[in-house]
Amino acid sequence: MILLKREVSTVNYKMLRRTPLMTIMDWEVTTLKVQNRSLKIHLLMVIKIQIDSVLREMIFHLIYEAQKQRAEDKKYKNKNKIKRKVIITITEICTFTIKYIRYIEVIILSHHFVIGFSFLLGLLRLGTYLMSSRPMQHMYINNFT
């Protein structure tokens, strides 16, 4: 069941870039009911994004760091605990899909982000901070309400 669907949104850097750093092509939210000891409802969100090549390289690096951190976590964590899960597939046309379940966290370069829009924006801000000296406060979002 689709709960929510938004129109195309774009993330720009005010007065700093002539082309958008990334464009949100489409996103939707669905509910998944998980029957356990108690009934749990999770949100599954899929975001399709068109990104430029510079941001793509930074995302590859962040994914690599996150995978290393998760591998270390598995050595010390009990298998019964919630496993962090981020499924990211990147196609040749630089469109990637992030599928995630709410409340699961991932560690990227020692920074905690709750998976969701805060994760996506945090990834952009961290990537921008690491890639250049541009101030992060110049980032703004169009039609993202």
UniProtKB/Swiss-Prot annotation:
It is found in: Membrane. The lineage of its organism: Eukaryota, Fungi, Dikarya, Ascomycota, Saccharomycotina. It is a single-pass membrane protein. Its main location: membrane. This is Putative uncharacterized membrane protein YAL026C-A. Partially overlaps DRS2 and YAL027W. One of its GO terms (cellular component) is membrane. The chain crosses the membrane at residues 104-124. Keywords: Membrane, Transmembrane, Transmembrane helix.
